[in-house]
Amino acid sequence: MSLATAQSARGPAKRRFRDTQIEMAHGAGGKASRRLIDGLIAPHFANPVLDAMADAARLPFGGATLATTADGFVVKPLQFPGGSIGELAVNGTLNDLAVSGAKPLALMATFILEAGLDVAVLEREIAAMATAAGRAGVPILGGDTKVVEHGMADGMYVSTFGIGTVDARVRLDPESIRPGDRVLLSGPIGDHGITILLARGELALEADLRSDTRSVWPYVEALLELCAADIRWMRDPTRGGVATALNELIDGSPYGIALFEEALPVNDMVRGACELLGLDVLHIANEGQFLAVVAPGAEDAALATLRAMPGGERATCIGEVRTEPRARVLGVSSFGGTRVIDMLVGDPLPRIC
């Protein structure tokens, strides 16, 4: 989650940050992250572009609109089934641009390396970044490298910057959502977070599970070609998961969201791990999925388009915008039962990206 994702522009007035120390939860993408950004960081950097609080900043430039975004990656372990820190860094940055309606143009990367890091590991991650960027047709134009003493970093950290051009047809705005709009999800959730947990050996389970890390731009581009005017909002539900992303959307809104819990696409292994650990899959991070709120008339065509693409077969409608309850996400079961779905609290899975 980038700096801007912490608060919708319609959210409540910012409050002073009163925590006296930084804790792991401040980086988890949930309520603590929001307090840090709203109460400490954003007030110092306040400007009209930042105040829009989108996944990427939009800047008019020569008759076009540019989108810029930055991200940092501290995942542990560095390599895991389905990906690694290098691939994650590229895809995560591309995705922040994509869900802002921007075609990625270029990236930059900064490496913080720990003395003693095996050069073979560094080269592996640089190669992974080159492969992921090449797959997306996006060059990495430059960056920086710093080295810190042994024991002062966990092998390596990666920071990225991305720039893209916003499609002229895009009118993404949380305030544009209306009752009846559909909430679409591109595919199964929870794979990345649970994969990282298993890769650490913290759970005595064996599973054929892989991170979902990928660029979502091809899917977003297909939707823009199909129905750009009918797309109200998009977001990639990384840290904090689907629950946090949807709560950010309706924060301060006159509307709420009904989330159809039985419709959520979740792999059996992920569901089982969440039940075993007492985790809510809606709070688990994803690195290759996105949410889109679309006008009701666009739902069928949008889903058909996504499902026709490799990797989009399980795209589905998981909810709709409603007049009640205001500014809340309400989970609805197949039996008609309901529960309030809040943003992530705490940090159940630290350093997952």
Short names for language-model regions:
Residues M1-C353:
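Helix-biased detector of long, well-ordered alpha-helical tracts
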